[in-house]
């Protein structure tokens, strides 16, 4: 069942499916902002932060952060601009995502196709 009423929910509860139409991307594993409301961190993807660092206890890939972010943007849509803060604006098709619950910072961990 697709979880509705997303605009009123900051984090999608674990186990729920939901739609995400991407509107902007921060780095190679998210967050990805969705038209439907949630910000998601893509589960199963390891990417450096934009400053080149890696989080403690997480894999630290060799790929630089900008290349990883740009690859994610191409994967989920078409870049259409950039915000003053550095978010890449995207236009892409809706993805069906499965929530893994909260990963902090009002973000939902999710696998999406």
Regions found by a protein language model. Give the residues of each.
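Small beta-barrel nucleic-acid-binding modules, primarily SNase/OB-fold domains
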Residues: 2-113
């Amino acid at each position: 069942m697709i979880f509705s009423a997303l605009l009123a929910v900051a984090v999608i509860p674990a186990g729920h499916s939901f739609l995400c139409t991407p509107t902007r991307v921060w780095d190679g594993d998210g967050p990805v902002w969705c038209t439907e409301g949630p910000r998601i961190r893509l589960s199963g993807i390891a990417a450096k932060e934009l400053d080149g660092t890696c989080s403690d206890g997480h894999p630290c890939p060799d790929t630089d952060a900008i290349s990883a972010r740009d690859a994610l943007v191409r994967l989920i849509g078409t870049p259409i601009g950039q915000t003053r803060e550095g978010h890449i604006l995207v236009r892409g098709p809706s993805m069906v995502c499965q929530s893994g619950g909260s990963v902090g910072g009002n973000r939902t961990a999710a696998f999406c196709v």
